[in-house]
């Protein structure tokens, strides 16, 4: 059994280099036209592959096991993280969980946290492609978050806010976090502790996006010091040196200096606000309905199955199927062990 990866050709060179270390055949990496937001082109390629009955398509945007895994694993893991911090902060509450939508796997942890703590669930997307915010479209460079459509596994009707983050913000803050001059600015002018500066150096573009969205959420909701916001650093900086070099060549040909670092930090971190939508019931139905055009019209999901997801009963029954899924995994593991 060979694994085949299908992803846009505009992704970083480092991402492709990482994949190349894991495949035995170069043709097992299929590059589709476009950038991060060109998801439809991936589906088209998968439709071609699916014509061969020997191929099994694993679509993280539509297979509910992705939702279940994050709800059952990521959610409790984040709960334990919060509880550990809260033990030292009596009275602390969990106000929100913030996650870029991507395939809508990680954001499923918000359902678990909402059940346990009553927290809000915040969906994040690139401002250059404001699908959830405005039914919009466009290209962007926040690699790791998909858009131009609403994933089938996204429990839209339990989402509370949507936040847009510009790829200009993530690109330029990446420059601050990854350069000596940027780190020196954070230490000397902003008094950021060295441990935090070191941690920021590990963050990739979608990780920075999530952090900015968490800041926007806290500011929009007017949260205080005892109202926590949880987010996740979903990728690493080691995936983006080529993108960073391209940014410097494009905008900082004469060098990235302390003034550039200060301007980037002031504009994109200290000025992180706006493009936040608190969802009404009408907004939720609008976003839910938008998924019709991908899943029913283009990909043939039966309308009845599509509509069933509008009710929380569907999602509760999905969670109830977890023991069956665990049994299937155990059966597969045993079969692999015998082989």
Tell where the protein language model's regions lie, with residue ranges.
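Active-site/ligand-binding-proximal alpha/beta "capping" segment
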Residues: 49-104, 108-109, 169-204
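Hydrophobic beta-strand scaffold residues
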Residues: 3, 26-29, 57, 121, ...
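Short glycine/serine/threonine-rich phosphate/pyrophosphate-binding segments
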Residues: 1, 12-16, 97-111, 131-132, ...
């Amino acid at each position: 059994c060979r694994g085949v990866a299908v992803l846009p050709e505009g992704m970083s060179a480092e991402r492709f280099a990482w994949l190349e270390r894991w495949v035995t055949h170069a043709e097992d990496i299929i590059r589709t036209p476009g950038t991060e937001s060109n998801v439809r082109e991936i589906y088209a390629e998968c439709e071609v592959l699916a014509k061969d009955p020997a191929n099994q398509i694993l679509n993280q945007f539509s297979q509910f096991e992705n939702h279940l895994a994050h709800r059952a694993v990521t959610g409790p893991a984040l709960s334990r993280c919060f509880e550990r911090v809260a033990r030292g902060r009596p009275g602390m509450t969990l106000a929100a969980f913030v996650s870029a939508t991507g395939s809508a796997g990680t954001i499923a942890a918000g359902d678990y946290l909402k059940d346990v703590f009553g927290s809000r669930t915040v969906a994040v997307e690139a401002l250059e492609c404001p699908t959830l915010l405005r039914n919009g479209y466009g290209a962007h460079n926040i690699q790791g978050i998909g858009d131009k459509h609403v994933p089938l596994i996204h429990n839209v009707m339990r989402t509370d806010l949507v936040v847009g983050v510009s790829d200009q913000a993530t690109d330029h803050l990446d420059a601050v976090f990854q350069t000596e001059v940027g780190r020196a600015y954070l230490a000397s002018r902003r008094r950021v502790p060295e441990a935090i500066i070191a941690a920021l150096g590990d963050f990739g573009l979608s990780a920075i996006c999530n952090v900015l969205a968490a800041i926007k959420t806290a500011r929009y909701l007017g949260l205080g010091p005892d109202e926590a916001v949880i987010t996740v650093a979903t990728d690493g900086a080691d995936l983006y040196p080529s993108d960073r070099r391209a940014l410097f060549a494009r905008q900082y040909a004469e060098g990235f200096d302390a003034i550039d670092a200060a301007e980037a930090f002031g504009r994109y971190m200290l000025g992180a606000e706006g493009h936040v939508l608190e969802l009404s019931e009408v907004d939720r139905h609008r976003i839910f309905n938008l998924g019709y055009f991908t899943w029913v019209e283009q990909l043939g999901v039966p309308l009845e199955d599509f509509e069933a997801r509008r009710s929380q009963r569907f999602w509760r029954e999905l969670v109830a199927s977890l023991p069956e899924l665990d049994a299937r995994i155990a059966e597969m593991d045993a079969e692999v062990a015998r082989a």
